């Protein structure tokens, strides 16, 4: 995480760091079955970590009496399926499946291809377009099925088809939903906070609500009248000026809060593969330790509502992707804390993701295991007025 941030979804197991499952754990899940660990020196992860993982895995295999069943294949160069890596992988599979010869030491020079013609020999420093050309001119060598697609086989089903079936079965078996259940599933804890650095300037009251875990929630309040709370996925609260002006004109005292991962609290160390929503890194880091960001955002909104209302219920206005956390907060807070819920341009329901596999989703907008109990839009039925 220090090097480059969280990685692909298949490498992400919710709560894995909380229960001690790391890179070594992936290897040990297979032990004592044969495992070849392939790595490039210039890959995303520091190579020193690869060596540490390989050393510990080798020790574990040795303790299990399967010393020859684990090996490391490393090569110079960046993230890529290099020729030397492919050569060793084929040799490894040959040994395991066809009784081929032993590979020898973990780092074997005979598996590295050397030469002076960089158009023909892999230096380990880049991609190999000649291989792509070979596949184009020899299409038969690149396909196993008659058409080149397993989806053309009789009875073939995609992973999306399987997910839809599982999702429908889970939806049909849902128990009765309660605020307590939502708190438990989303991990919504106490909404404690302290008001820090309050000041007034240009008829706006400014403050920072410091949550119990130290997270700062910047808030700005303007106007007079019945309290309203605005939360948004906007990077700059100034884009909310027309909405705030309309609410103030309607006789509202409006508080705008930057809940975690949005606005002033959005900046992380790394962009998640360049995704425009910077809170993906925050969501994955939370998920690695078993925390859903949606639940934490709901806590932030509950705290901001208590601050904005001063003992009175507030109207909650949620814009964009902030609607998911707002729906959770409104459901568990109820009418004692919220007089209404208005959703401006909210994201689709979670169920829409199963209906259309082309729709993107964000780790930041989902709650782990929640589908077995509810869809996030189920939480809005009593209070909401979507636009």
Predicted regions and their residues:
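Short gly/ser/thr-rich secondary-structure transition/capping motifs
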Residues: 15-20, 368-371
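Beta-propeller blade termini and top-face loops
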Residues: 1-12, 16, 57
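Serine-hydrolase-like catalytic core of hydrolytic proteins
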Residues: 1-7, 25, 313, 326, ...
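Alpha/beta-hydrolase-fold serine-hydrolase catalytic core, especially in secreted/extracellular enzymes
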Residues: 4, 31-33, 38-218, 222-226, ...
